[in-house]
Amino acid sequence: MSAFEITVTPSRLKQKKRAEGREPAVVVMAPFSAKAIVQFEDVPITKTARRQVRVLNPSDDDIEVKVMKAIREEHNLSLEWMEHTVPARDEVSMELVWSPVLEVACKETLQLIDNRNFRKEVMIILKSKSNQPVKNPRKFPTVGKTLQLKSPTGAGKTMKSVVSAAVQQKKRMSAAAAPPSKQTWRVTAPSRPAAWAHPPPQAPLVEKNVYKTPQEEPVYISPQPRSLKENLSPMTPGNLLDVIDNLRFTPLTETRGKGQATIFPDNLAAWPTPTLKGNVKSCANDMRPRRITPDDLEDQPATNKTFDVKHSETINISLDTLDCSRIDGQPHTPLNKTTTIVHATHTRALACIHEEEGPSPPRTPTKSAIHDLKRDIKLVGSPLRKYSESMKDLSLLSPQTKYAIQGSMPNLNEMKIRSIEQNRYYQEQQIQIKAKDLNSSSSSEASLAGQQEFLFNHSEILAQSSRFNLHEVGRKSVKGSPVKNPHKRRSHELSFSDAPSNESLYRNETVAISPPKKQRVEDTTLPRSAAPANASARSSSAHAWPHAQSKKFKLAQTMSLMKKPATPRKVRDTSIQPSVKLYDSELYMQTCINPDPFAATTTIDPFLASTMYLDEQAVDRHQADFKKWLNALVSIPADLDADLNNKIDVGKLFNEVRNKELVVAPTKEEQSMNYLTKYRLETLRKAAVELFFSEQMRLPCSKVAVYVNKQALRIRSDRNLHLDVVMQRTILELLLCFNPLWLRLGLEVVFGEKIQMQSNRDIVGLSTFILNRLFRNKCEEQRYSKAYTLTEEYAETIKKHSLQKILFLLLFLDQAKQKRIVKHNPCLFVKKSPHKETKDILLRFSSELLANIGDITRELRRLGYVLQHRQTFLDEFDYAFNNLAVDLRDGVRLTRVMEVILLRDDLTRQLRVPAISRLQRIFNVKLALGALGEANFQLGGDIAAQDIVDGHREKTLSLLWQLIYKFRSPKFHAAATVLQKWWRRHWLHVVIQRRIRHKELMRRHRAATVIQAVFRGHQMRKYVKLFKTERTQAAIILQKFTRRYLAQKQLYQSYHSIITIQRWWRAQQLGRQHRQRFVELREAAIFLQRIWRRRLFAKKLLAAAETARLQRSQKQQAAASYIQMQWRSYQLGRIQRQQFLRQRDLIMFVQRRMRSKWSMLEQRKEFQQLKRAAINIQQRWRAKLSMRKCNADYLALRSSVLKVQAYRKATIQMRIDRNHYYSLRKNVICLQQRLRAIMKMREQRENYLRLRNASILVQKRYRMRQQMIQDRNAYLRTRKCIINVQRRWRATLQMRRERKNYLHLQTTTKRIQIKFRAKREMKKQRAEFLQLKKVTLVVQKRRRALLQMRKERQEYLHLREVTIKLQRRFHAQKSMRFMRAKYRGTQAAVSCLQMHWRNHLLRKRERNSFLQLRQAAITLQRRYRARLNMIKQLKSYAQLKQAAITIQTRYRAKKAMQKQVVLYQKQREAIIKVQRRYRGNLEMRKQIEVYQKQRQAVIRLQKWWRSIRDMRLCKAGYRRIRLSSLSIQRKWRATVQARRQREIFLSTIRKVRLMQAFIRATLLMRQQRREFEMKRRAAVVIQRRFRARCAMLKARQDYQLIQSSVILVQRKFRANRSMKQARQEFVQLRTIAVHLQQKFRGKRLMIEQRNCFQLLRCSMPGFQARARGFMARKRFQALMTPEMMDLIRQKRAAKVIQRYWRGYLIRRRQKHQGLLDIRKRIAQLRQEAKAVNSVRCKVQEAVRFLRGRFIASDALAVLSRLDRLSRTVPHLLMWCSEFMSTFCYGIMAQAIRSEVDKQLIERCSRIILNLARYNSTTVNTFQEGGLVTIAQMLLRWCDKDSEIFNTLCTLIWVFAHCPKKRKIIHDYMTNPEAIYMVRETKKLVARKEKMKQNARKPPPMTSGRYKSQKINFTPCSLPSLEPDFGIIRYSPYTFISSVYAFDTILCKLQIDMF
C-alpha cells in the first residue's frame, strides 16, 4: 500500500542582508571628521562594479573640490569627475566605476583637496575574484562534524539550528565556484568492476533473525526520490495544481505488485488512495520488522560511487525512520560528495532539488515529541526501549571514542585516543555481497557494532608482525571503491578519522544529516567506512511502510553544494552486476609498510634497511621526533641550580618529548630572562659581592683608585661628562654593549645598591640608573646648592667619580665572566654589540675621555689591572635544531649533543668555527664521531663524516636512531622479560575464563533467539492492526486538509482578483485627475511664455533703436579719440622705446654686475670691513672739502670789507688746512699700505701652507712607497718560500710512506726558519721606522716653534705700530676739533644773513661731490673684485696642478699593482687546478674503498641470513616431529611459500639496489655537470670583466690625455676672456657716464611732458564719467517702471535705517568704560613707547640671559615672559626658535621633580608647543633627540596633578599631523625601550583618572595659565593645530582629559598596546 501527503506551506522570503560595502561613502570636507571607506568586495574579473561617494560641505561657503591624488591606472578605476563645486551646506555625489582586468586585493587612497587647501583621504579597498572555475583536486570536502546522538527536541528548535548553521556556513564559505558544465546530479559509473572487497560487518545480536529467508529488493542512492518516501511529502511537480483539481477522493482498495513500474512525481494521478473500509490480508511471514538479518548482511553487494552534489541553499532530504521521537534538531552527519550506491533491479529517476531564495521558516509540529515517543514505544515495545536506553549511554561519548572502543585495543601508553587513526587495532573491512530484496525497509544504513570480532582478529594478526607499525595498521587497509576520476579521494579518506577532535570537526564547513538508527534498518545494511558514512544510502520497495508524519530537515551550505538550476538527475544503468570479492588483496601487499623504528621489536636500523618502504609522511614524522629529542638534549635545564654533570637518561627523555609539542632549545639570553626570581638573584648578588671583595679584585681596584685621585688617570678638561649629553650617550652606548643581566649585576656591586627593574631586559631602568648614578653625584648635590653643580670643583669631583666607577665596572665584569658566577654562563656582550672584548671597551673609553694616555692597557697592567675576556663565536652560537637537513651538517650541534651524552666539556674547544668550508665541517663531524668511538660505541652502516656533511638523509637518521637505540634497548629487554613472566603465569587462567564466557554467551544467544521469535510474531500482529487504522485516519485527514487548502486557494484567488481590480480602477481615476491638472498647467504656462516673449521682443526693439542712435555719436567720438590715441601712442611709444633701450642697457649692465658680484660673496666679510674703512675715509674727505669751500666763500665775502686782513687770515688758514690735509693723506696712505701688506702676508701665508702640505704629502707618499717596496720584497720572499714548500709537499706525497716523518720534520724546520727570519727583519725595520719617526718629530717640533715665534713677533710689531698711529691720530683729531669749533663760531657770526643761499649752493655741490665719490667707490670696488678674481684663479690653477700630479702618481702605482694581481691570479688558478685533480683522485679511491666495504658487508649479511634460514629450517623440522601430520603439511606449505616469497624479496632488493645505484650515479653526474657549467660561466664572466677593464683603462688613458689638453685650452681661453672682460667693463663705465648725462636731461624733459599728460589724464576721466553717467541715467530712466522705483525707494530707506541703527550701536558701545580705558591706555602707551621697551628687545635680552649662567628663579620669570610672547607674537621668535627648542629640551631633561623644576618644565613645554603651532618655526622645534625627553616627561608627570602631561600630549598631537614626523615618532615609540614607557604611562594615566572618579571632593582647579578652557570645552575636545595668539575661540589650548589625550595620540600614531 502507498500513501501520499501534501504539505503546502508558503515559504517566507528571507530578508536580504544589507550590503554595507555598497552604501554610499560620506566624505565630510571638515577637520576631525571620520575617514570614508569605499569597498569593492569580490568583484568578478571583466565585470563592472559601481560605488557612490557623497562629498559633503558643512561650511557656509561654496568650495571647489579637486581630486589631487587619483588611483593608479593599472587598476582600471574611473571617477565621475576630477573637479567639482560643492555648494554650501550641500553635497555632491561621485560615482566610482571599477572594471577589474586582473585578480587583485589591495588598498588605495583617493585624496581630495578644496580651495581652502584642506585635504581629505578616501580609502578604497579593491578585491576582485576570478570568474574562471577553480579546479579543486579535492573532490570531497573534509568532513567537519561528528555524529552525535541527542535527546529529541522540538521542530522549531531544529529549524533554528539548521538556519543558524546555514548562516554561519555562508560566512565561512570560500568563493570556489563549480564548473558550469556540471549542472546536474548524476551517478558516476566506475571505470572497472569493484576490485576491492571487505569482510562483511556482523550485525549485533539483537538484530539477528534466523527464521527469515533473504529476498532481493532494489536499493537506490541517497537522496531518495521523494515520491517513494512514505513519511514525507513528495516534491511538488509543475502540474500539481491541475492534478489536485482533478482529484476525486473516492475510497478504493488497490494493491501494487512487485513488478510494478516506478511512479514518477509528475504522474500524480496514478497514486493509490487508502480507504478506511478496505481489508487487506497480509501474511505474517511476508511482513518483517525493520531489522537487519545476518543473511542479508552476508549477501548484500555494496560499492562506493561518487556523484556531484551542486550548490543549493536548502535541500530537503527526508530520513525514513519509524521512530518519531527523533527530531531533526540534533547534530547531523556531514554529507560529502561521496555516497553509497546500492544497485537496484530497475532504474529510478532522482527527484529534483529546487532552488530557494532562503531557508523555509520552521513549521510547528503537529504532535509533541513526548507523544511520538510514547507511540513508538507502544508500537515497537521492549526492543525500542532497550535501544533508547543503550543510545543514552552512547550519546555521552564522542563518535571517535565509540568507534575506537569497539575493537580490542591495548593502550600501551595509557593515552586518550582522539581519532580513529590512533587506534592500532581498529579496522573496517567491507566486501560486496549479493543484492537482496528489502521488502519492508525504506532506508538501510551500516552498523559498526557488528564488525568487532572480525576487526579485532584482523588487527591482532597485523599487530603481531614486526614488519608493521602499530600506528599504521589502521590506515592502509581501508580501501574505497575505484572511481572514474583518479584525483578523487577514496572512501576511507572521507571518514571521521580525518578530524583530530570533535571541536575541529564541528568547525568544518559541512552539510549534516541525522545519525543512523539501528532499529530502523531492515534486512540489509550498506557497508560503511571507518567512521559514519558521508551520506546514508536509501532504499525503498514497492510496498514501503508509510509514516503518518513528515520529517524534513535542511542541509547547510557547503563548498560542494552550490546553487544550480534544478535539473533531473541521471542514474547509471544497473544491468551490470558488480563482482564479488573474497578478500582485500591490497591489504597484504601494500606499497608502504611504515615500520615503527622506535618499537621494541625493531632491532635493525630501519633507515638503512627499509627506507624504500617508508613514505614521506612517516619520514617527516620521525624527523620531528628526532628534532624534539635533540632540542631537549641541548636545552639548558629549567632548574639552573641543578647539577649539570648528572647523567641524562636519553631513552626516557626521548619517550617524554616524543608526545609533546616541538620546543626549540632556548639560548642563554632567553634563559637568563627567567633568572629574576628573588632567591636566585640574591644568591647571585652574594657571589658577586664576594668576588668584588676578594683579593684579586681589591688590590687592582685600590691602586686604580689611588691613581685616579692623584689625577695620574684623569678625564680631559674639555670633557664635562656631567654636562655633555652627547658624551653621556656615547658612554651609555658602550655600557649597553654588555648583557643587561651582567650589566645590572656589575652596577649593583660597584655602586653597592640594588636596582629596581621589571625584568633583566629593562634597558630604560639601566639607562636611568647610569645617568643618575654614574654621571651625577647625589651626595655632592645634596650637600651643596644647585649652583655648585656648575662649578669646576664639582666637575673635577664627578670626573673622578665616573672614571673610577667605570674602571671598577669593567674589571669586575671581566673577572665575573672568567669565574662564571652565573651557572648557565650567558654571554657578556649582546650579539649585536660592535665590541666583543672588554679591552676594546676600555680603549674606546680612553680614546674619548682620558687625557695624555697612549695605550691605557700598558699603564693599567703595571697596577695589576688586566682585562682578558673575549667573546667567541661558540659563545653566541644557537644550538636549537630547526631543520635536521641543515643543522647537523656543520658538526657544531652534533658535537654539543655528544658532550651532553658523554658528559664531556672538551669537545667544543677543538671545533673549527665558523665552519665555512667543507673541510672544516668534516673535521667537526669527525670530532663528534671520534668521541663516540672513544666511548666504545660502534656505529653501523658505514656512517662517515662526509655523509653527515653532505646531508645524506638515511645515514643521518640512522646515526640518530642508533644513538637512541643504544639507550632504549636495555629498557626494552627488561620490559619484555617482565611481560613474558607475567603472561606465562596468567595464561592458563585466561584460557579457562574465555571458555566459560563462550559457553555462557552461546546459552544466552539461543535463549534470546527464542524470545525474539515469539515476541516479534506477537508484535507484528499487533502492529498490523494499528497500521491499518493509522493509514485510514491519515487518508481522511489528508482529504480534509486538501479540500480546505483548495477552498482557501480559491478564496485567496478571488480576494487577490478583487484587490487587483480595485487598484486598477483607482489608478485610472487618479490618472485622469492628474492628466486634467497637467493640461491646465500647460496652457497657463504657454500663455505666460507668450506674454513674456512679447515683452522681451519689445525690449530688444527699443534697445536696438537706442543702440543705433548711440552708434552714430560713438563713431564720431571714436574717430576723434582714435586719432588722439594713435598720435599719443606714437609719441609715447617712441619715448617708451627709448626708455626701453636705455633700461635694457642698464639691465644688461646690472646683470653683468650682479654676475660679477656673485663671485664676491665668498669674501663678503672682508669686503664689509674694507667698505667701512672707505666710508670713514669718504666722510673725512667730504668734511674736508666742505670746510675748504666754506672757507673760500668766507674769504671772498670778507675781502670786500677787509681785503688785507682777509687775505692774511685766508693764507694762515690755508696753510693749516694744507698741513692737516697732508697729515690726513699720509695716514690714509699708511693705512692702505698696511692693508695691502696684510693681504700680501695672507697670500704668502697661504702659499707657504700649500707648499708645506704638498711637502708633507710628498714625504708621506715617498715613505709609503718605500714601505710598499719593502713589503713587496717581503711578500716575494714569503711567496717564494711558500711555493718551495708546496713543491716539496707535492713531492713528499709521491715518496714512500717510511720517509713521511722525516719530510714533515724538514718542512716544519723550514717554516720555523722563515718565521724567525721574517720576525728578525720586522724588528730591524721597526727600529729604523721608530728612529725616523723620532727624528721627524724633533724636526717638526723645531719648525713649529720657529714659526710660532715669528708669528708672535709679527703680531707684536703690528700691535706696536697700530698703537703709535692711533695715538698720533687722536692728538691730531683733538687739535682739529678745537680749531674747527673756533672757526664755526666766527662763521656763524658773519654768515647769518646768507644762510639760505649757501644752503642752496651747498646742496648742488654736495650732489656733485656725491657723484664723484660714488664713481671713486665704483672704481675701487672694480679693482678690488678684479684682484680677488685673480687670486681665486691662481688658487684654482695651483689646485689643478697638484691634483694632476697626485692622479699621475696614483695611476702609475695602480698599473704596477694590476700587473702583480694578474700574475698572482694565474699562479693561483694553476695551483687550484692541480689541487682539484689530486683531491678527485683521493675521493675516487675513497669511494672505491667504501664500495668494497659495502660489498663485503652484503656478502656477510647474505651468509648470516643463510645461516639463520638453515637454523629456522632445523627448528621447523624439530617442530614437525613433535606435531601431527596435519601440522607437518601446514608447515611445509608455509615453508615453500616463504622460500618463494624470499626469492621474490631478494630479487626485488637486487633490482632496487641497482636502481638506487643508477639513480644516485645519475644525480651525481647531473650535479657534476651543473658545477662544471657554473665554473665555465664564472670563467667566461671573469674573462669578460678583465677584457672590459683593459678597454676601460685604455679609454681612461685617452680621456686623461684629452683632459690635460682641454685644461690648457681652458686656461688660455679664460685668460683671454678676463682681458676682454676688463676691456668691456671700462667701455661700459664710459658708456654709463654718458648715459647718465642723457638720462638726466631726458628726465627733465620727461617731467615737463608728464605734467601735461597728467593734467590731460586727470581731466579726461571726469569728463568721460559725467558723459557716461548722463547716458546711463538716460537709458535707466527709459527702463524705469513704477514698481522698480518703489523697490529702489525701499532699498534706500532700508539702507538709511541700517546706517542710523549701526551708528546708534557703535555710539552705545563707545560709551563702555572699559573700551574708553583701553583707548586711553593705548594713547598713553604710544606716547611713552621707547625702542628699549619693544618686544624684540625684550626677546633679545631674554635670549642673552638664557645663553649665560642663571638660577632657576630668574629663569622662571624669563621663561614665563617668553611663554606669553611665543603664544601672542610667535613671529618675533623665528630667529631664535632653534635655540629656544634646544634649550627647552635640555632644561626638561635635566629637571627634577621639585616645584621650581615643575614650573620650568611647564613653561618650556608651552614654549615648544607655541613654536610648533607656528608654521615658520615648526621645523626647528621638532628634534628626534627630544623624543626621549618627551617620553621621559610623559612617564614622570602622567600621574601628577599638573598640565605638563596634557601639554606634551598636545605637542605630540601637533607633530603627528605631519606624515614624516608621525613616522619618526611611531618608529621611536614602537621600539622595545619605548614600549615599556608607553605601557607604564598608559597604566598610570588610567589609575589617575580612576582616582579622580572615586574621589569624594571635586578635584581642585589646576594652577595653569589657561585653566579656563576646562569650563568652556568638553573633556573629549581636540586642541587647535593653529596658533590662537592668546585667545581661545573654538578649540582648547591643550587636551582637557589626560586619558583622552594619550589615547588620541596612540590612535593617531597607530600604536596598539594590546
Swiss-Prot record:
Residues 1004-1033, 1386-1415, 1467-1496, 1656-1687, 1690-1721 form the IQ domain. GO terms for biological process: actin cytoskeleton organization; astral microtubule nucleation; brain morphogenesis; centrosome duplication; centrosome localization; cystoblast division; establishment of meiotic spindle localization; establishment of mitotic spindle orientation. GO terms for cellular component: centrosome; microtubule; microtubule associated complex; microtubule organizing center; nucleus; perinuclear region of cytoplasm; spindle pole. The modification Phosphoserine is found at S151, S360, S388, S390, S395, S398, S491, S495, S497, S501, S504, S514. Keywords: Calmodulin-binding, Cell cycle, Cell division, Coiled coil, Cytoplasm, Cytoskeleton, Developmental protein, Differentiation, Microtubule, Mitosis, Nucleus, Oogenesis, Phosphoprotein, Repeat. Residues 498-507 have a biased composition (Polar residues). The keyword Cytoplasm applies. Disruption phenotype: RNAi-mediated knockdown has no effect on nuclear positioning in fat body cells. It is found in: Cytoplasm; Nucleus; Cytoplasm, Cytoskeleton, Spindle; Cytoplasm, Cytoskeleton, Microtubule organizing center. Residues 528-548 have a biased composition (Low complexity). Residues 134-155, 476-548 are annotated as: Disordered. GO terms for molecular function: calmodulin binding; microtubule binding; myosin light chain binding. Residues 1614-1641 form a coiled coil. The modification Phosphothreonine is found at T364. InterPro entries: ASH, ASPM, CH_dom, CH_dom_sf, IQ_motif_EF-hand-BS. PANTHER family: ASSEMBLY FACTOR FOR SPINDLE MICROTUBULES. Required to maintain the structure of the centrosomal microtubule organizing center (MTOC) during mitosis. May have a preferential role in regulating neurogenesis. Required for germ cell mitosis and oocyte differentiation. This is Protein abnormal spindle. It comes from Drosophila melanogaster (Fruit fly).
